[in-house]
A protein has these predicted regions:
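Sec-dependent N-terminal signal peptides
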Residues: 4-14
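Sec/Tat signal peptide C-region and signal peptidase I cleavage site
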Residues: 15-21
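Beta-loop motif signature
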Residues: 21-47, 51-53, 61-62
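Boundary regions of SH3-family modules and the immediately adjacent low-complexity/disordered segments
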Residues: 59-127
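Short, flexible, mixed-charge glycine/proline-rich loop motifs
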Residues: 129-133
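The canonical Cys-X-X-Cys-His
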Residues: 135-145, 179, 183
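Gly/Gly-Pro-rich "capping" loops immediately C-terminal to redox-active cysteine motifs
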Residues: 140, 144-168
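C-terminal capping alpha-helices of c-type cytochrome domains
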Residues: 169-191
């Protein structure tokens, strides 16, 4: 458990850099004043500017050439950062093309979006603690708790969703999103 706490602290330090913040809740994103999708809780972003109730953020990640409707952390890490309402190359700027191990084409991308300023925060630790507590309370009631590094970032969402679908556990969407992000941030690397 000590090594897990060290990983948690290291992940938080990496996520919170100069002008870097995280989303404290899943919220809408806009591009040029038009809603284009949503950005997930605990997504690390660079704050470009704040103006009252709105903030302009910059986000970097990867997009599959075959599915332009979401930005994920990287080609090998399937942690979803944004989900767009429609597939469109106008939602992001392509930085470079990358081919994965299976020959699939991906784009390293960045985008500048508007979000509600109250959805930003710099204390990821508080969110991690909240998620960890909810995960432990909810999941240890039925079985031995899986360590967060038991699965990859791509495996955690389906793992938790299967518990909900079979009615073993009931979680609000906000609780589920927070727990999934916490587990993904501490997941094992994809091979």
């Amino acid at each position: 458990m000590k090594s897990f706490k060290f990983v948690l602290i290291a992940a938080c330090a990496a996520a919170i850099g100069l002008n870097a913040e995280v989303l404290t809740k899943t919220t809408d994103i806009s591009l040029g004043g038009k809603k284009v999708g949503k950005i997930e809780v605990l997504t690390p972003v660079e704050v470009v500017s704040k103006d009252g109730a709105k903030a302009k953020i910059k986000l970097k990640g990867a997009v599959s050439a075959n599915y332009l409707a979401q930005i994920q952390r990287s080609v090998k890490n399937a942690e979803i950062f944004t989900v767009f309402d429609a597939e469109s190359e106008a939602n992001f700027k392509k930085i470079k093309e990358v081919e994965d191990d299976y020959g699939e084409l991906w784009y390293e991308v960045e985008g500048t979006y508007e979000v509600a300023a109250d959805a930003l925060g710099s204390d990821a630790n508080a969110l991690y603690k909240q998620a960890q507590q909810k995960y432990e309370e909810t999941c240890s009631a039925c079985h031995r708790l899986h360590e967060p590094n038991s699965f990859t970032a791509a495996q955690w969402p389906a793992n938790l969703q299967s518990m909900i679908d079979t009615n073993y556990v009931s979680l609000e969407e906000t609780e589920l999103n927070l727990i999934v992000k916490y587990l993904q941030h501490n997941a094992k690397d994809a091979e």
